[in-house]
Amino acid sequence: MKQLYHLTLRHTVLFFKDKGRFLTALITPIVLIVLYMTFLGTVYHDSLDSIVKYFNVSQKTIDAFVNGYLFSSLLAVSCVTVSFCSNMIMVQDKADHKIKDLLIAPVSKTTLALSYFISTLLITMIINITALLACFIVLGTSHFVLPVKDILYCLFDIFLLTLFGASLSSIINYFLITQGQISAVSSVVSAGYGFLCGAYMPISQFTPAVRTFIKFLPGTYGTSLIRNHLLRSLFLKLGTKVPANVMNEIHQNFDTSFKLMGHTVTQSMMYLIMIGTCFLLTLIYIFLNQSKINM
């Protein structure tokens, strides 16, 4: 237990001490913020405004909705991209042959693998909880405060998405052994995941074939969960101003409600998908570390 603690602490400290790696982890969230500041924020504002323009919905409510949508996208992306970057410590140790030194010490392979996994979870949770606090402050400027229940749901959603990101990155990074591979994977994940989870643009804007494909990806439902809970109070407020058919249009346009193969995917189903995926990915990572592949 003491070895696990010290190894986890080592990986975590190394990540935060390396400013380059830390900034790399934040590239995707920064790009997302820039996109929203330059044009996406206006696009979403105009999109919602066009839907509710015939109803008595204040601009403050629309602004709060757009801000909440931005932060839900940012958090959903960060949980995965930051996980990949923080888990690169494991790959870096292999590339620098430091992992051999660690395994020479009286440390089991399982303990070392677990320390990388826990460190990835810890780093990603720290960064995303900080981002969530910033979200609450920004929403507060719109005189909108989330109920405690929704805050707890958001924290649980972040944990689930972080667990998903940590387990997925651990499996992929397990097979990486060089600096070039690190750079390639980081670039692909940073550039691609935002599109795949519907952070850069709503899934409803894609072609039917792409929409269907994305709906089979578990990260899509993690994004939808945090989006639902971050915006739930605003949905309730909008529900008092607009009819049910308009609310349904808002849910469809902003990816908070999905239909898969003709069936509505409820939030309970979304949780089952996310928990089941995390469990399966964690089992695969455990299996890899029990085998004699690579490490």
Which residue stretches match the model-derived regions?
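Perimembrane loop-to-helix junctions flanking transmembrane segments
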Residues: 47-63
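Hydrophobic alpha-helical transmembrane segments of multi-pass membrane transport proteins
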Residues: 31, 35, 62-141
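Transmembrane helix segments
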Residues: 35-44, 173-234
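Short, membrane-interfacial amphipathic segments enriched in basic
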Residues: 1-9, 209-216
